[in-house]
Swiss-Prot record:
Binds 2 [4Fe-4S] clusters per subunit. Belongs to the complex I 23 kDa subunit family. Residues 55-84, 95-124 form the 4Fe-4S ferredoxin-type domain. One of its GO terms (molecular function) is quinone binding. This is NAD(P)H-quinone oxidoreductase subunit I, chloroplastic. It catalyses: a plastoquinone + NADH + (n+1) H(+)(in) = a plastoquinol + NAD(+) + n H(+)(out); a plastoquinone + NADPH + (n+1) H(+)(in) = a plastoquinol + NADP(+) + n H(+)(out). NDH is composed of at least 16 different subunits, 5 of which are encoded in the nucleus. Keywords: 4Fe-4S, Chloroplast, Iron, Iron-sulfur, Membrane, Metal-binding, NAD, NADP, Plastid, Plastoquinone, Quinone, Repeat, Thylakoid, Translocase. It holds the Pfam family Fer4_7. One of its GO terms (biological process) is photosynthesis, light reaction. Its main location: plastid.
Length: 179
């Protein structure tokens, strides 16, 4: 009879422990129910990108001196620079510049090390196409600036969590009274 009582006590303890675990997990689930949804309705709502966001590369043909620093610092030797040496003025003349964004890893080394600042990162991240050959941008396509998300009236922009914290900090700072 004694082992039977011990078995019932163990069963009761295990039942209470299981009920406590279920109750704890249910409380966690209920605490998450009060939070706002994290997802956004993508085509109609877009979040504003951060200040140092690395999107599509913008290229200014007139500033480029064909030094090929961008090719040397690229971890995958991606930019294709075609140039011709002008013997009468002893300078390189840029003929063609292209980047294949299907291969690009958006590291930003080319932008950082460019001596003439002819390369810059834009906020454009929508580069999807049905054909991967359309991702090979020449100097004309690289020179086009993307349309700003903020200026588009059909798209509602949503600030991400870091931008909300920054704006809240600024509003708190503006309310402080200094003598």
């Amino acid at each position: 009879m004694f082992p039977m009582v011990t078995g019932f006590m163990n069963y009761g303890q295990q039942t209470v422990r299981a009920a406590r675990y279920i109750g704890q997990s249910f409380m966690i689930t209920l605490s998450h129910a009060n939070r706002l949804p994290v997802t956004i309705q993508y085509p109609y709502e877009k979040s504003i990108t951060s200040e140092r966001f690395r999107g599509r590369i913008h290229f200014e043909f007139d500033k480029c001196i064909a030094c090929e620093v961008c090719v040397r610092v690229c971890p995958i030797d991606l930019p294709v620079v075609d140039w011709r040496l002008e013997t009468d003025i002893r300078k390189k003349r840029l003929l063609n510049y292209s980047i294949d964004f299907g291969i690009c890893i958006f590291c930003g080394n080319c932008v950082e090390y460019c001596p003439t600042n002819c390369l810059s990162m834009t906020e454009e991240y929508e580069l999807s196409t049905y054909d991967r050959h359309e991702l090979n941008y020449n100097q004309i396509a690289l020179g086009r600036l993307p349309m700003s998300v903020i200026g588009d009236y059909t798209v509602r922009t949503i600030m991400n969590s870091t931008q909300i914290k920054i704006s809240m900090d600024k509003s708190l700072d503006s309310r402080t009274i200094t003598n």
